[in-house]
Amino acid sequence: CALPIYLQGRKGLQSYFVKRVHKILLKHGKTMIAWDETASYLPEDAVCQVWREHDYAEVAASKGNRVIVSLFTPHYLNYSPFFHTMKSIYNFRQVPADFSAKQRELIIGGEVCIWGRQPTVEDMEGLTFPRLLAFSESVWTAPEKRDWRFFKRRLKPVQNKMESEGTEFGGGWRDLFTPK
């Protein structure tokens, strides 16, 4: 006699839970978004939010799931801008070059995250800007059309405007002063 899936260890229980929550959300006309730990058993109409590595985006997209890319590196802004630099965010490919056309269509967007357990509320704005600007341009601009030097030149006027409106820019400018 086979055990019910929810009694087949942690993965079985998690799979059972995800499917139950999915049914509840569908009943209320909502779309499920789940972390990439569920990629291998996520219902096809759910969205997979990938935070660990692109391999999970490939697993989810291969199954037909839509995907949001928010990889820990470089998208977690609560980590030091000296490790997750503005340039690494700017140059990041949301969609790997080796994805098929069908897989590329299933990448519906990207997201940067800032988790409050490390920085203080006061630090969050400085950690977010200017890196959020680099992320925005990287998501909206095809990799072959990006120009890091042109982007850097455009930042200073934006910084001046935002600071005049009370937005704090952080110290993550190290990569602005390095060649290319």
Named regions from a protein language model:
Residues 1-3:
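Short, small-residue-biased leader/transition segments that mark boundaries at the very start
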Residues 5-180:
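Substrate-binding groove of N-acetylhexosamine-processing glycoside hydrolases
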